[in-house]
């Protein structure tokens, strides 16, 4: 870890606890800052609070007193806290310095960074890059939105390691100096409009990933979205991926993945399922080539890596029916990919947090949907969608109830697909929890012998 002294003896307010706020507070204390943590929830019974207080960190919970800003000129904001929250809104008005936990990870580490963002595919790309590093003798440590707090991992890496960091639009907002050596934008579509208010704001948040890059760095992006992704701020060397044509970067031609005219692998030898994953694979391969991962390790990974939990995850078979957990599909594009992945009749479990989206764009992908079981805040919207297409629609209270109701309508060879097209926060704390509940309920219905 770098001996960063820029925060020594400074008063710093961490807004929002959770995992990233907890680790950020501990790191700030280690860097010599005077730390206060604030969370709108009552944390009086939280074990983490006692741990922080034992380190001399003050914790104020249950509300956001604006007086906390009087003596704390530096704010570290948890990515899940919107800028519209009163204390952050007031900090902006006062012109206070607002950092992110991801920014801290950059300030304390000399390790080069591969940063991955995008509306869809970023977790798959990040995981695949990590697997390719694992198959080599190089070290690539996963961090960020994938579940490993960036500022914690950054304290553990060597300067010769790579930090492989998944970044959400929330984490990219507010970065100042953060500079990945290799940045990947998988794609940009409409998402998180409840947080960003409009599509332009969301797109601009994603573009933050390359704002500090120089000519010595790389941006990897989808060739067919280059007009959306690129801007005047872009200084890095841009390389593209495409499944449709030859590009300056990496592409598929005659059934092979090709880089600089060299065939790397036949696409028939890939294990990761789904046409949409070809783009994810191309992005990961190109990043690893640039990072110096041997081609043999890349091929070893591509012929063994089968995917990640909660992303079109095969859960199991009950009689003749296969169940798939796609709980990470928190927007319509991800669900389009899921619905497009099966030729069998589908019982589609969908619904969740209402972000103001309409779902008519899913209609062209519903041909194989035989029935829908809908739940969550968007239950009525999905019921209306299903009825408009002549589908059988059943309403459920939640994911567990949805799996129960599936048993009443299921027919031989139906695929049962949880692909909510919505975030989980109306009923579950995370999409992982939602997916685990689906799996638990599936197992509860397995016959006992």
From Swiss-Prot:
ATP binds at residues 118-124. It holds the Pfam family Mur_ligase_M. GO terms for molecular function: ATP binding; UDP-N-acetylmuramoylalanine-D-glutamate ligase activity. Its EC number is 6.3.2.9. GO terms for biological process: cell division; cell wall organization; peptidoglycan biosynthetic process; regulation of cell shape. Keywords: ATP-binding, Cell cycle, Cell division, Cell shape, Cell wall biogenesis/degradation, Cytoplasm, Ligase, Nucleotide-binding, Peptidoglycan synthesis. It comes from the Bacteria. GO terms for cellular component: cytoplasm. It catalyses: UDP-N-acetyl-alpha-D-muramoyl-L-alanine + D-glutamate + ATP = UDP-N-acetyl-alpha-D-muramoyl-L-alanyl-D-glutamate + ADP + phosphate + H(+). InterPro entries: Mur-like_cat_sf, Mur_ligase_C, Mur_ligase_C_dom_sf, Mur_ligase_cen, MurD. It is an enzyme of class 6 (ligase). It is found in: Cytoplasm. Pathway: Cell wall biogenesis; peptidoglycan biosynthesis. Transmembrane segments: none annotated. The keyword Cell wall biogenesis/degradation applies. Belongs to the MurCDEF family. Cell wall formation. Catalyzes the addition of glutamate to the nucleotide precursor UDP-N-acetylmuramoyl-L-alanine (UMA). This is UDP-N-acetylmuramoylalanine--D-glutamate ligase. It comes from Staphylococcus aureus (strain MW2).
């Amino acid at each position: 870890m770098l001996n960063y002294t820029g925060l020594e003896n400074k008063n710093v307010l961490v807004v929002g606890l959770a995992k990233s706020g907890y680790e950020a507070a501990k790191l700030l204390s280690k860097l010599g800052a005077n730390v206060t943590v604030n969370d709108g929830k009552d944390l009086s019974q939280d074990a983490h609070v006692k741990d922080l207080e034992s380190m001399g960190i003050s914790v104020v919970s249950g509300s956001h007193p604006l007086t906390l800003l009087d003596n704390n000129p530096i704010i570290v904001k948890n990515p899940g806290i919107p800028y519209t929250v009163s204390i952050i809104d007031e900090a902006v008005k006062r012109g206070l310095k607002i950092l992110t936990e991801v920014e801290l990870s950059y300030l304390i580490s000399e390790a080069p960074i591969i940063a991955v963002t995008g509306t869809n595919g970023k977790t798959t790309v990040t995981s695949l890059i990590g697997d390719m590093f694992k198959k080599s003798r190089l070290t690539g440590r996963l961090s960020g939105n994938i579940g490993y707090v960036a500022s914690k991992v950054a304290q553990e890496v060597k300067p010769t390691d790579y930090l492989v960091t998944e970044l959400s639009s929330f984490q990219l907002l507010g970065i100042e100096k953060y500079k990945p050596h290799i940045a990947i934008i998988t794609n940009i579509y409409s998402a998180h409009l409840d947080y960003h208010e409009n599509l332009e704001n969301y797109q601009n948040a994603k573009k933050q990933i390359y704002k500090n890059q120089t000519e010595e760095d790389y941006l990897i992006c989808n060739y067919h979205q280059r007009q959306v992704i690129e801007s005047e701020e872009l200084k890095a060397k841009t390389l593209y991926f495409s499944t449709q044509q030859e590009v300056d970067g990496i592409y598929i031609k005659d059934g092979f993945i090709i880089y600089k005219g060299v065939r790397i692998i036949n696409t028939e030898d890939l294990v990761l399922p789904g046409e949409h994953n070809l783009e994810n694979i191309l992005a990961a391969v190109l990043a690893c080539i640039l990072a110096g991962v041997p081609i043999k390790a890349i091929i070893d990974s591509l012929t063994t890596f089968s995917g990640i939990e909660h992303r079109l995850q095969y859960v199991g078979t009950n009689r003749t029916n296969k169940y798939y957990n796609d709980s990470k599909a928190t927007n319509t594009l991800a669900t389009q990919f899921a619905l497009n992945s099966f030729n069998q009749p589908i019982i589609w479990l969908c619904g969740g947090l209402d972000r103001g989206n309409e779902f008519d764009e899913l209609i062209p992908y519903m041909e194989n949907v035989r029935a829908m079981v809908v739940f969550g805040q968007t239950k009525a919207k999905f019921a209306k969608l299903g009825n408009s297409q002549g589908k059988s629609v059943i309403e459920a209270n939640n994911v567990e109830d949805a799996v129960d109701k599936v048993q009443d309508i299921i027919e031989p060879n139906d695929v049962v697909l949880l692909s909510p097209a919505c975030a989980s926060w109306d009923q579950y704390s995370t999409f992982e929890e939602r997916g685990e509940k689906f799996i638990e309920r599936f197992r509860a219905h397995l016959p006992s012998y």
